[in-house]
Curated annotation (Swiss-Prot):
This is Argininosuccinate synthase. Belongs to the argininosuccinate synthase family. Type 1 subfamily. It comes from Buchnera aphidicola subsp. Schizaphis graminum (strain Sg). The keyword ATP-binding applies. L-aspartate binds at residues 121, 125-126. It is found in: Cytoplasm. The gene is argG.
Length: 401
């Protein structure tokens, strides 16, 4: 192996990345610096993480609080676009990868490291997402992906490897699920979910209550939207992070934001996951409610196209690309009109807009009324219909010749 000097590892403190540190030292003869991105994962995952990294053999461990930036600069912009991957998934894991990779590259550059490492497996999407970002931001840096090189392909072998290296770990063979958590969502994969006929059990859900345990009475909340972003919850103006945290708390007790889906991974494998995105789900529905008021037909169709394309761009890890920037610019332009207030009814997993208003609303009661009005001439429709149906009329006439 080449004698590298310093490697910056995207470190989670879990079993995989704990084993990667001694493996890098043994196989690449390097100094390992652990980089930890705090994007809202559980505090128990972060408690003592610096000590854990050093015990595993890292020469240093740095933790960066990225929660506010993550929600403000990554989650909120994507919510504007209405992106839902394959019609269901609010991209909670995918959207977190660009900021981790970006900050990892910046940190590596600041300490003079030329080598990057991640703990993504060779079967998943994250290896692609990380390495596309690395290529876009630091093409001169070498990437080490241990899961594509080593033979430690089971939990048992990883635990045995750490024992051989006399590295303490709290991990056991009991863990059967793979989880990913940030301020937007938490995902659960593996274990009994790998058999599609198995129903998710209580262990598959972490944030939200069961539908049966949700309150018997609905809760009504008010959101204020400005330029396509939620800025206030129940008349309390908050930062993006505080908005999502408050809505996560409210939504979780009403079983909102649960999905159990089978998705198409970028690498061609279908995978099943239980995702919980309570706050993001509430925001998504609120934004679409205001859009109904302010978008004309063509604007609405265009926003839907943006959302469809953006969902693939984000899922695939193409954040640092011209197409993502172009889609975002278009969504930002449309969202400049998305201002207003919406009241939502939360009840046993459902989010129902019940009141909405906007100063930019194109809805006019005078025109829409089923009663008598003085602004709409019904006779005007005759000419419109004749022109709108002209091609159909000519086609039918041709068949009669």
């Amino acid at each position: 192996m080449n004698n590298f000097k310093k490697v910056v590892l995207a470190y989670s403190g879990g079993l995989d990345t704990s084993a990667i540190i001694p493996w890098l030292k043994e196989n690449y003869h390097v100094d390992v610096v652990a980089f930890v991105a705090d994007i809202g994962q559980s505090k128990k995952d972060l408690n003592g993480i610096e000590k854990k990294a050093l015990q595993s053999g890292a020469i240093d461990c740095r933790v960066f609080d990225l929660k506010e930036e993550f929600i403000k600069d990554y989650v909120y912009p994507v919510l504007k676009t209405g992106s839902l991957y394959e019609g269901n998934y609010l991209l909670g894991t995918a959207i977190a990868r660009p900021i981790i990779a970006k900050k990892q590259v910046e940190f590596a550059s600041s300490i003079g490291a030329k080598f990057l490492c991640h703990g993504a497996t060779g079967k998943g999407n994250d290896q692609v997402r990380f390495e596309i970002a690395y290529a876009a931001l630091a093409p001169y840096m070498k990437v080490i992906a241990p899961w594509r090189e080593w033979n430690l392909n089971s939990r048992e072998s990883l635990l045995e490897y750490l024992r051989e290296k006399n590295i303490p770990t709290s991990a056991t063979l009991e863990k059967i699920y793979s989880r990913d958590e940030n301020s937007l969502h938490i995902s659960t994969e593996g274990g009994l979910l790998e058999d599609l006929w198995n129903k998710p059990n209580a262990d598959c859900w972490n944030w939200t209550v069961e539908l049966e345990d949700a309150p018997e009475q609905p809760e009504y909340i008010s959101l204020i939207v400005k330029n396509g972003s939620v800025v206030s919850v129940n008349n309390e103006f908050l930062t993006p992070l505080k908005c999502i945290e408050k809505l996560n708390k409210i939504g979780s007790k009403h079983a909102i934001g649960r999905i159990d889906i089978v998705e198409n991974r970028l690498v061609g494998i279908k995978s099943r996951g239980c995702y919980e995105t309570p706050g993001g789900t509430i925001m998504h529905i609120a934004l679409r409610a205001i859009e109904q008021l302010v978008f004309d037909r063509e604007s609405f169709k265009w926003r839907e196209k943006i959302g469809l394309e953006m969902s693939s761009v984000v899922y695939d890890g193409r954040w640092f690309t011209p197409i993502r920037k172009s889609l975002q610019a278009s969504a930002d332009s449309l969202s400049s009109e998305v201002n207003g207030e919406v009241v939502l009814k939360l009840y046993k997993g459902s989010v129902i807009p019940v009141q909405k208003k906007s100063s930019n609303s194109l809805y006019s009661k005078e025109y829409a009324t089923f009663g008598e009005d003085e602004v709409y001439k019904h006779s005007d429709a005759e000419g419109f219909i004749r022109l709108f149906s002209l091609s159909s009329r000519i086609r039918a006439q041709n068949k009669l010749k």
